[in-house]
């Protein structure tokens, strides 16, 4: 099967989602900050909201692939199972004494059961209920409800850990410790799952590499015309962008990258929290963003990159030039600064385009939705009171794997 994402707005054909599950029940007021959520979720309501999101997509002929299903099916393949467990259950993470019983337990699980443990985590008590353990300093120092294998609630935001860039995929190095293990699951899926293993596609970046070179998919927007827009943000570093750029340029698919220097704040952790593409040459942008400095990266000979720094006032011109259009159509909702800040916090600009001029957004951002509608954008709304507590909207919660090319 072919996988390709040539733009942010081409007709969406296939997408990876993750329906929130028992990993959300591991969130507590005490650990939510470490796990990068602003509050604990009401799981049943979050699942209802996510199901509505999926129904909107399937109602527009989008094939929805669920991460948990892909992972469970992948883990039935012995090589994939060993790859994941060797990296997740080992002496470095669990200590020598606890590793053997935990590995024995996980080795004996079905693919679906193992996927559940990898995503939802496992506590000391849950391990001891299932298997006897020798004396272990690691276990002795833990309470019964302490997590020997932490959960991965941020798998909800499938955009970040992997993103398809033109004809290949970037499996991303994550900035925060709470998300680093997500990458291992995606690497196994793309390498061994039958849906992907039979296809040939470039892997632009491998996510388990160590060091400060991080890239997260929420900062990556494939705007078309061989160009990519990337945020230099709280989660994506200049080192990561340069590493990704060198591989994209070597692949010959991308001809330039526009890096946007963002404010490093929680509210604006990724580029897609403040701007997304909604139609040809058209972006919805948070009113409080202003114009930011940009840097244009282009290939320059063998393994070389040229970098041009652009003034903040040239931001729109630089993006338009990369797109090959005369100018951008920038849609900024006219509202006071307090209303704008509230809607940005609630992911008002975090829209998922499923076709040119057709987007999915949270229903709560009434001002932005009405403004976009008045400017010819078809806005499909979904509830997000619970799923939005991790600071992510429809764009964050989706990893497109196939879009139609723009005419």
Segments from the language model and where they lie:
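The feature marks the mature, well-folded catalytic cores of soluble enzymes
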Residues: 1-407
